[in-house]
A protein has these predicted regions:
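Glycine-rich beta-alpha loop elements in corrinoid/cobalamin-binding modules
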Residues: 2-123
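Hydrophobic positions in alpha-helices of CheY-like receiver
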Residues: 43, 47, 230, 293-296, ...
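Short helix-capping segments at alpha-helix termini
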Residues: 44-50, 231-236, 330-334
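Catalytic cores of alpha/beta
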Residues: 66-68, 252-254, 313-328
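N-terminal [4Fe-4S]-dependent radical SAM core
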Residues: 110-163
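Canonical Radical SAM [4Fe-4S] cluster-binding loop centered on the CxxxCxxC motif
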Residues: 155-193
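Conserved SAM/AdoMet-binding glycine-rich loop
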Residues: 196-303, 309-311
């Protein structure tokens, strides 16, 4: 197809300009798998001695029980969870095969084997350093949006530097969530000043002052500390991120977040039914969500809510009632 040919040509151009020894490909979603494998195949075709490693969100959730060795026709290694330690171990292993690997799948014969070394610990969130866009021509990226809703547009319209306020989830109780996954289970924070240092470094590198905090759910206390340090250090940014609609987000805190540059939040309402919210162990009620979303909206902050229908035991009447409560939230300008 035209898309295939375009992807192949772009890959060839990069491989000719920068002959690699090691290529890492992030596979965040199912829709990225085909492109990732196509790029990996091209790397192997042009530079047979280059090593290819896959990682990312899709790998972390869907390939934890990998048993089919055919994927290694395209790549050499697959790493799980946070990439810093596995990639560092892989680089050292390629220099010296006696060095151990960490959470890395390899093919041995016709079998998939996971190599790991528990003694080699992951880097703490405070020590992972600042993300970098070095070598990436950001001017080549265009803004796209599929609808006029200003909240929905944020995901693809504009330029957002990505950062994480805290690693993992501080709540870790929702029954529909896989709490065993490292990116949820291992909760770690960094100081507000460390976060502001990273923000300033990204602004200097990219020239962009828009930030998307991609936490599972940013902790209210950490957001308060971050907002206070942004204001105290006179760092002017525009930011948005994911939260839980919990009572800690008072009118006073929400107004502080707005002053620090917050323009939008996204959170999981899931179902507008207190019985089902209790079954989910969400730790919120419909009335509480209404109060919190109203506080954000009153401060001029856009609010997006995730919803799900057909949760186990949900009755027809509960579905109707939930739809009506969501309609009321829209009508009142809360979301």
């Amino acid at each position: 197809t035209l898309v295939d040919e375009t992807l192949d040509e772009l890959t060839r151009e990069k491989l000719r300009a920068f002959p690699p020894d090691l290529v890492g490909i992030t596979v965040p979603f199912p829709g990225n798998v085909y492109g990732a494998l196509r790029i990996a195949r091209m790397v192997k075709s042009i530079h047979p001695k280059a090593r290819v490693v896959l990682g990312g969100g899709y790998v972390n959730t869907e390939l934890r029980q990998l048993s089919d060795p055919r994927v290694f026709d395209f790549c050499d290694y697959i790493t799980l969870d946070d990439g810093e330690r596995p990639l560092l171990a892989l680089v050292e292993h390629l220099r010296d095969p006696n060095q151990p690997l960490v959470r890395t799948y390899v093919r041995e014969g016709n079998r998939v084997v996971q190599k790991t070394t528990p003694a080699l610990l992951d880097l703490h969130h405070r020590d992972t350093g600042t993300p970098t866009y070095a070598g990436l021509d950001l001017s080549q990226y265009v803004s796209l949006f599929e609808m006029l809703n200003p909240m929905h547009r944020l995901w693809s319209d504009g330029r957002w530097n990505k950062l994480t306020v805290a690693k993992g989830c501080y709540w870790k109780k929702c029954t529909f969530c896989d709490l065993s996954l490292d990116y949820i289970a291992r909760y770690e924070t960094a100081t507000a000043d460390v976060l502001v240092d990273r923000i300033e470094a990204l602004i200097k590198e990219t020239g962009q002052t828009g930030f998307h905090f991609v936490d599972e759910a940013a902790p209210p206390a950490a957001l308060r500390a971050l907002a206070e340090r942004l204001i105290a250090r006179r760092v002017a940014i525009t930011w948005w991120g994911n939260i839980r609609f919990e009572k800690s987000f008072t009118k006073e805190l929400v107004e502080l977040l707005a002053r620090s540059g917050c323009i939008a939040v996204s959170g999981g309402l899931e179902v507008a039914s207190d019985r089902l919210l209790a079954l989910m162990q969400k730790g919120v009620t419909v009335a509480q969500v209404a109060r919190v979303t109203r506080a954000f909206s009153a401060a001029g902050i856009l609010v997006h809510a995730y919803l799900m229908y057909g949760f186990p035991t949900q009755t027809e009447q509960e579905t109707i009632d939930s739809l009506e409560r969501v309609r009321q939230l829209f009508a009142e300008g809360c979301i």
